[in-house]
């Protein structure tokens, strides 16, 4: 009898599987003692042409907890530079590619699992995901989506009834399995593995596949390879700028954790800045601070340079150098534009020198003021008044802190004067647009570590999921929300 599960009747495409056995290994999903759907991302279903009202929790569990009705399930092969050291012993260690489906927008999407059991690349691990790890990924990806950052999403999170032991969580801890919704799971490290085995033919095959599938606007262009790398550079620079403006620290920017389409994924010990600290390091095991917040743009550029090694098997050095040459300018332009939006302005409204001066002054203030990074922008959103344009004295410091003695006077006055200066450069008719921009760019609450714990503790102690759902709903509806499609030029 044909399945009535809408996930099992989707028109799956064997895009990655068609590359052949050199790129992946067929695996079996783990079986779990229990299945309880804890999160379902109904906002993604219309992209697949599905009506959330017709998709039941049991449909999610059957497809994404029991993994029935799909084969082959593919553990993808890749290598990578981990903390600067090449590691050839990598691959999908606790997940697999469940399937690929073309959305109504024409884009191909991956369903990729996390916590679905052992694979040939588990390296002695159990292949499982803690429930807290799953909740953390939901929080990170949904908040970044709310900010307009390009990111993979969590489609479902199912608690699976096992006790897991971890060194970085109080144990035993609860288990889960997640299905991610990403544009692709092809990484920089997917190419690096092929270079390791000296397979220029497979580099060529994979590059053709990536261009045809994710950069199809370049098909037929005699300079498609060079333009692909230049565009990947732009996308990666944009992504780094988005993270920095968001105050987001990915924590583990190894080459196997960077997507070939410039999308955030592989969330591990991520963190959002509480206070602004350029040297903040999110991962407890990053003892040298290699992947600290301020290093993220440079690490992204370095990883693009490392990608030149496998791509250099089929591309000229001149094309690769030309492609990466614009990284710095692209990053700075995107970062400036995004920071100005968080301050309520559009870059094309302002003289660049004045705008850049405001950004620098803002960061100098945040270094010393007793206020959180995202908290500052949320309070600016709440306190901004159109009267600030005509009356400098109306811009009072008490919205930053009531402890005015703790506020560095020189930094505060410098910021206030520059913000007022930008307001006077705009016509009065633009003031309502500033308020709208502040609301769209600055959610009222960010998932800094205390907020994450305030959501997790009720789950851990009382199995109370209401605080998580309340926070997610707040992001969905706060400031008119963000679109569920990712707006990136040429992101086909």
Swiss-Prot record:
Catalytic activity: L-seryl-[protein] + ATP = 3-O-(5'-adenylyl)-L-seryl-[protein] + diphosphate; L-threonyl-[protein] + ATP = 3-O-(5'-adenylyl)-L-threonyl-[protein] + diphosphate; L-tyrosyl-[protein] + ATP = O-(5'-adenylyl)-L-tyrosyl-[protein] + diphosphate; L-histidyl-[protein] + UTP = N(tele)-(5'-uridylyl)-L-histidyl-[protein] + diphosphate
Entry keyword annotation includes GTP-binding: no
Residues at which ATP binds: 91, 93-94, 114, 126-127, 180, 187, 266
GO molecular function: AMPylase activity; ATP binding; magnesium ion binding
Record InterPro entries: SelO
Protein family per UniProt: Belongs to the SELO family.
NCBIfam families (UniProt xref): PRK00029.1
Protein name: Protein nucleotidyltransferase YdiU
């Amino acid at each position: 009898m044909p399945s009535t599960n809408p996930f099992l009747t989707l028109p799956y495409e064997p895009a990655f599987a068609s590359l052949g056995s050199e790129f992946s290994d067929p695996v079996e999903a783990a079986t779990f003692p229990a299945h309880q759907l804890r999160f379902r991302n109904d906002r993604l279903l219309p992209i697949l042409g599905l009506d959330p009202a017709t998709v039941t929790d049991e449909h999610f569990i059957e497809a994404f907890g029991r993994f029935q009705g799909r084969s082959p399930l593919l553990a993808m092969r890749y290598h990578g530079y981990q903390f600067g050291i090449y590691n050839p012993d990598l691959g999908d260690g606790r997940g697999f590619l469940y399937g690929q489906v073309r959305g109504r927008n024409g884009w191909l999407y991956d369903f990729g699992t996390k916590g679905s059991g052992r694979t040939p690349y588990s390296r002695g691990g159990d292949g499982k995901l803690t429930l807290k790890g799953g909740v953390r990924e939901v929080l990170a990806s949904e908040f970044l989506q709310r900010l307009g950052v390009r990111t993979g999403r969590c489609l479902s999170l199912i608690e699976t009834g096992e006790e897991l032991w971890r060194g970085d969580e109080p144990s035993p801890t609860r288990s889960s399995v997640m299905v991610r919704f990403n544009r692709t799971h092809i990484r920089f490290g997917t190419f690096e593995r092929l270079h390791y085995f000296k397979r220029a033919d497979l580099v060529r095959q994979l590059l053709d596949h990536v261009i045809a599938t994710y950069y199809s606007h370049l098909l037929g262009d005699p300079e498609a390879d060079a333009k692909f790398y230049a565009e990947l550079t732009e996308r990666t620079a944009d992504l780094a700028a988005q993270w920095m403006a968001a105050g987001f620290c990915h924590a583990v920017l190894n080459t196997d954790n960077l997507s070939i389409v410039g999308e955030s994924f592989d969330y591990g010990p991520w963190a959002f800045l509480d206070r602004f600290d350029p040297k903040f390091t999110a991962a407890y095991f990053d003892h040298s601070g290699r992947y600290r917040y301020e290093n993220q743009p440079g690490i992204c550029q370095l990883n693009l340079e490392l990608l030149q090694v496998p791509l250099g098997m089929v591309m000229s050095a001149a094309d690769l150098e030309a492609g990466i040459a614009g990284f710095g300018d692209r990053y700075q332009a995107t970062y400036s534009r995004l920071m100005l939006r968080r301050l309520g302005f559009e870059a094309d409204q302002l003289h660049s020198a004045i705008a850049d001066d405001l950004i620098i002054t803002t960061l100098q203030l945040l270094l010393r003021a007793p206020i959180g990074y995202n908290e500052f922008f949320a309070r600016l959103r709440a306190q901004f008044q159109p009267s600030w344009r005509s009356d400098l004295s109306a811009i009072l410091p008490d919205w930053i802190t009531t402890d005015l003695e703790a506020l560095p006077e020189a930094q505060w006055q410098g910021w206030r004067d520059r913000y007022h200066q930008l307001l006077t450069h705009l016509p009065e008719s633009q003031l309502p647009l500033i308020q709208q921009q502040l609301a769209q760019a600055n959610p009222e609450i960010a998932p800094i570590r205390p907020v994450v714990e305030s959501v997790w503790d009720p789950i851990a102690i009382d199995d109370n999921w209401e605080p998580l759902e309340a926070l997610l709903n707040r992001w969905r509806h706060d400031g008119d929300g963000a679109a569920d499609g990712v707006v990136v030029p040429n992101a086909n």
